Amino acid sequence: MELKDYYAIMGVKPTDDLKTIKTAYRRLARKYHPDVSKEPDAEARFKEVAEAWEVLSDEQRRAEYDQLWQHRNDPQFNRQFQQGEGQSYNAEDFDDIFSSIFGQHGQQSRQRQATRGHDIEIEVAVFLEETLAEHSRTISYNLPVYNAFGLVEREIPKTLNVKIPAGVGNGQRIRLKGQGTPGENGGPNGDLWLVIHIAPHPLFDIVNQDLEIVVPLAPWEAALGAKVAVPTLKEKILLTIPPGSQAGQRLRIRGKGLVSKKHTGDLYAVIKIVMPPKPDDSATALWQQLADAQSSFDPRKEWGKA
């Protein structure tokens, strides 16, 4: 009976990491899957690849296999294999061989290593108004179930009622321990990670912990000053526009930004001057009077003389 070269079967090197081996396994499993492949030996090759993956995907069994491979030319190793000459074997058989050659440690190899389940990550959309206070949210996701070959066999729909804390930010990750896929051989479950995505708002832009809102003003409101009702995340407030306000000017409204555990941001009102529609004769006359009264004003004086 010959010890199979699992690395050659997978087309990888003994020094390759698990990620590389897993990639090779998935490629070969798809290639030789009996339901897909038309090759005459597809089923046998598929079983051989699955057998190699069963050993190389387990850290402890891979280490034992590597040790067996290093001793494959030892007399004791050869005697053990000659006893089984002509017999078929699978990935489990080398556990017995390892035990007979290396003693008690080989017997312990039957106790498969506990493996932690996979983490799952889902995106949760949150409105700006919802960040002001803790709120409950029902989320649904699919829990993948893996077969013995490490491929997703099916998915189980799952629903949870979770609490989204106040002050969550865009891209923040919330961990729900043990809500991922089940562990193997007594290993712990994976976790569910909620990745917060703050939905775009029609009025507010986020700047770190602060908010910005564009406040449209008529030219005379900017020139003379005004009191304007400005929306915040909770309610409208009356904002005083100082006389002579300029387009792009930012007026600070304290404590009306985003909320966090350590700090509450501010709301900045960014002034935008909006011209009225095409003026009639009376409005044109008024604009002309203003132009005559301010004839010395040059809005482009900073350009200097051409």
Swiss-Prot record:
Keywords carried by this UniProt record: Chaperone, Cytoplasm, DNA-binding
Protein's UniProt keywords contain DNA-binding: yes
Primary localization class, coarse: cytoplasm
A Gene Ontology molecular function term of the record: bent DNA binding
GO biological process: chaperone cofactor-dependent protein refolding; protein refolding
Annotated Gene Ontology cellular component terms: cytoplasm; nucleoid
Entry's localization field: Cytoplasm, Nucleoid
Family matches, as Pfam families: DnaJ (PF00226), DnaJ_C (PF01556)
Taxonomic superkingdom: Bacteria
SUPFAM superfamilies: Chaperone J-domain (SSF46565), HSP40/DnaJ peptide-binding domain (SSF49493)
Residues annotated as domain J: 5-69
InterPro entries: DNA-bd_curved-DNA, DnaJ_C, DnaJ_domain, DnaJ_domain_CS, HSP40/DnaJ_pept-bd, J_dom_sf
Function text: DNA-binding protein that preferentially recognizes a curved DNA sequence. It is probably a functional analog of DnaJ; displays overlapping activities with DnaJ, but functions under different conditions, probably acting as a molecular chaperone in an adaptive response to environmental stresses other than heat shock. Lacks autonomous chaperone activity; binds native substrates and targets them for recognition by DnaK. Its activity is inhibited by the binding of CbpM.
Family annotation (NCBIfam families): PRK10266.1 (NF007618)
Protein name (database record): Curved DNA-binding protein
Originating organism: Citrobacter koseri (strain ATCC BAA-895 / CDC 4225-83 / SGSC4696)
Encoding gene, per UniProt annotation: cbpA
